[in-house]
Amino acid sequence: MKVIIVAYNQFELLQMEIEALRLLAGIEERDLIIVDNGSEDGLRQWLEERPGMNYLICDEGGESYSAIVNYAKAEFQIAEDILLLNPCYMILPDSIEEMQRLLYADREIGAVMPKLIHNGSETAGNYTEAVSYIQEGKIASEVNLQQLKLTDGCVMLKRSMLEKVGIFEEKLFLAENVMWDYCVRGIELGYKLFECGSAFFYQIAEKQKGKENKQHALSDRRLLKEKWDMNYFNAIPNTGLLSYITESRETPLRVLEIGCDCGVNLLWVRNHYPNAALYGVEINASAAGVAKCIANVTVGNIEERQMDFGGVTFDYIIFGDVLEHLRDPEGTLNYCKEFLKKGGSILASIPNIMHVSVVRDL
């Protein structure tokens, strides 16, 4: 495995990261590729004084994340798994081994990320404390959770996925959007992405933005819209709504979501109810294409009332911030009752336009 670390004015954090990788995971300098993306803190001179270090210097600085990673892969002819790191994410004991174990637990798993412990959190107040707690077994492992999107600053990518998905999209600039695109491409090719419940990294500082700015964010958003025909990529489940599903974990639920988007709510159900049968309806064909990798998804408009679920009835029908967009929400609810199992429930959330989070920005 090769570790690619992209740094911008993070010299001290980078030194800490390199030492932690050596001490806690046995990763030596020959397995590292350090990219200095225009730092002004002495990183370049330090790299040039270390003959055993693999590194790249972006003289002008502000190179796109996609171009950096693609160039590093090509320059060093990487033909193995890759761990992409931002220096603000510090390795904790056993995390690399646990991520690798999960990565190869199933051939369909293409990439994994650790759980993140944030600086100053109740779990561990600082990095030294976090290391001690892991070594003493005070931070318990959790369930592995399948994800739609992985963090751009700490992700392990399997060689087979890298080869099949190909290069990172060089039209995109910001790391988070580059990873957004790569995750979607991987999912559509049949790969699964996971957060490893037994691997932990510590976010010791906020990510440096370098010369990234709003212009790059707007440009990326426009390019993603053109490529995927989606205004945004929702990878955060509506846990407030989904918390009303209270059956035991092994219950073979049948769940339908109207307006399922890319399937993040249905994926939450899959993670918490592995025996559930999942169905979705989504009007956006691109979003449905992603959701189809998770559930049985129909592309269509629920208000046309021509759905055919093959006689299946559902324990739950979910409307997450959907009803307010319909011409006839009451009629649609009455129509969907036809597919509701006796004793089943409709779960719906409707945004409150008078909520302080909306009003304060007016």
Q: Where are the model-predicted features located?
A:
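Conserved donor NDP-sugar-binding/catalytic core segment of glycosyltransferases
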Residues: 90-126, 352
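Short beta-strand-to-loop acidic/aromatic patch adjacent to the donor-nucleotide binding site
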Residues: 79-90
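S-adenosyl-L-methionine-dependent methyltransferase catalytic module, highlighting the catalytic core
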Residues: 170, 327-362
